[in-house]
Structure formats: C-alpha cells, structure tokens
Amino acid sequence: MDNRSVQIREALADGPLASEALRVRLQISRATLARALAHMPGEIVRIGAASATRYALLDRFRPLPEIAVYRVNTTGQIAPLGTLYPVRPDGFVMVQTDGATTHHEGLPWWLIDMRPQGFLGRAFAHRHAPSLGLPADVRHWSDTDALRAQLASGADPVGNVLLGEVARDHFVNAPAPQTCAPADYPRLAAQAISADATWSCAGGEQPKFCALSETGHVLVKFTAAEASPISTRWRDLLVAEHLALETLHGAGIAAARSRLLDVGTQRFLELERFDRVGLFGRRALISLASLDGEFVGNAAAPWPAITAQLAKLGVITPEAHDRSALLFAFGTLIGNTDMHAGNLSFISDSGQPYALSPAYDMLSMAFSPTSGGILRDSVATAHLHSVLDGATWRSALDLARGYVLRMSEEKQLSPSFKPCVEALGELQQAAAQNIAKLH
C-alpha cells in the first residue's frame, strides 16, 4: 500500500485529478483506489461528490497550514466560513462549513483584495517582513508570503473575511476602538509616513491611514507637513476629490462621504469606509480587478467593457453595470487618468449578484505630480469609448460641467490650480462637440 500511496502522490503533484482519471492512470480498480486513499489520512482533499469527485494532494512544501476562514456580518458577529487547504502544485481548496468544496489554481479570487498593496501595504510589509524573512518590497511577495504575513499578524484587512485564529482572536477580544479627533491626525500621519520609508510626496500615490472618527470608520488621505509646490498640488487634489464626490452625491449617485480638514500645515480628507458598519460590523468589498481575474480576464479594458460581461454572467447587477458606465464617462471628462480595475468595487451582504459600492478615488489625477516632481496643468483630449452610448456621455457631461463649476467657485483651491480648472473646461468643450455626434 505504501507504494500505491507514492504513486498517488506523484499523480496528484501536478494538480487535482478526477476519481476516474486517477484510477485509469494508476491502472487499478475503484475498490483498490478507495482503499489506497483511505490509507492516506491528512494528505488528500476531496473536491466535489459522486461522479464529479476529484482529489487534490495537500501541499507540504509551502510553509502554510490549513487556514481557518471566518466571516463577520454587518452586525459584528463572527462565524466560521470554512477551511482553506494549500494543495499541489500552487492551488487551494476551500471546504465550506456546509460541505461545499471549490478548487482554485491560485489564491481564491475573493481573497485577492486582502493582499497588502499600495501605501498601506508597504507600511504593513515594513512592520512584518523582517521577522518573517520576507522581501522588504511587498510587490515581490508571493501569495504564500502574503498569507504567512496575514496569519502571523492577525491582519485586519479590507472586507468581511478574517484568516486564521490570530485574526479571529484579535477581533473577538478587541475592545471598542477609540475615536480619533482631527487634532490627532498630524500624529497619525507622521506614524504612517514613518512606517513607509519609500514614500515620496512626488508621485501619483496619496499617503493615508485608517481611523475611527466621530462619523465612523474612515480612510484618511493627507498631504506632507512641509510646504512646497508639490504638497500644494496634493492639497488641491484632495479638494478636487471632495468636490467630485459631492458632485456625484448632488446627482443622487452613491459616493463615499468625505470631509476636508486643515490641521496645522496639513490637509486631510476623511473618506467613509463602506466595508465597515458601526463599530464592529463588516461588509464584503470586492474589486473589479478581482472579479475580472476570475470571470472575464480583460483587465486592460475600460470599466464598462468588463462590467457588461459581469452583468451578463449574473455576477453583478444590471444597475451596477449602468452606474459603472456613468462613473467611467464622468471620470473621463474630469481628467481621471487612474481608473484602473482596482479603483472600482462591489459590495455584498448575501453573495451574487453584487451591487456597486459607492464611488471612490474619483478626481482629476491628470494633474497629479509626476514621479519626477513635475506639476502638470494640461490634460489629454477625452476619448469617447464605443462601449458607452450617447445618453451616458451626455449625462456624464452634465455632471462634469457641474464639477468644474464647483471648482471654479471653490476658495480652498490655490491660485496655481486655476490653469488646471481651465484645462478641464476646455476638455469638456471639445468633448461636447464629439458627444453631439452620438445618437
């Protein structure tokens, strides 16, 4: 039987096999296969049932345990969701508490957004990489590296899923979080900067931290404390983001609630976290990038091209697609050059089809400082993608004009941002002529 176990391990080393395929490969009977598998406790994970049964080999080469997966609901109650098993060669099998099983060739798509990334991800790596022997640059982390760090730290990631017993214990035993006042923000900003030694105010990424404000759980973006043309530009862009969100609110379009605060020499923009409900409640938050990777595979396409496919598949609601299209058109007409698939997300309390989350990261990023510190005050002509119809472009143009009007009247914008506002007006004037050609 030991020899048979070796044969099974070799057969499953390259990935799961159906029961019949495994039997044929080993040239044995069904009864012999069943007996052989029974002698391999703790090595095999069964996927599916009956004629659809497949078998996967647990991966003992990756330094990962069997991972308990928990989910927190909107009222703040935590419950087991299942167990995640690493299997050969690089995949995972999720065994839910109800017995359902799913094989993933890599990290399950619904966990991808939990990977540390961006400014906050680099700060996370700064804290945990040395003790775990991981690369200092979080961009070089494998899925295994990311999971190891989250399990060891008990990370509290975006969304409503927690991985491992450390995270579960942290959540259950945590006291009520303390509310932060605006006066605390400069200190929290300094801590955030010190945790990411690679950050520079020149470049297209805004530093941020998470906090509990008097209005609820927030993500807080901030500018550098030192006065400079670059920090002035970022101060203006925080105002621009606030005004874009206010413009959407004014039109009845869901967008993150925001608040501008000037404390000392710094400007802060509070943005509501819509994956948090009350003190402890949570809601699933899934990026377009994650959904595209699992269901479509066209990440370079504009948002509406991807969401149209997702709506057709029943992954998101038709309304989510329609609003995604409007937001993309609006972003195009206000110079938002950063509409990648990670900047659009979906929320859910009960699975598919997912609804679109409130809009976020919507601003005129065409005017953000370059990595070399150049301040741009021009914007490229708007490209009217064919995936959007004329009615959507016309609705977006009305919103975009309202946004520019708000900026032209906004006293918190610096004089140096005036050419940017004028450039947006010219962009919209040219776009209006082309939109008029659409039915």
Please name every model-derived segment.
Residues 1-6, 10-341, 345-439:
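Phosphate/dinucleotide-binding and metal-coordinating scaffold of catalytic cores
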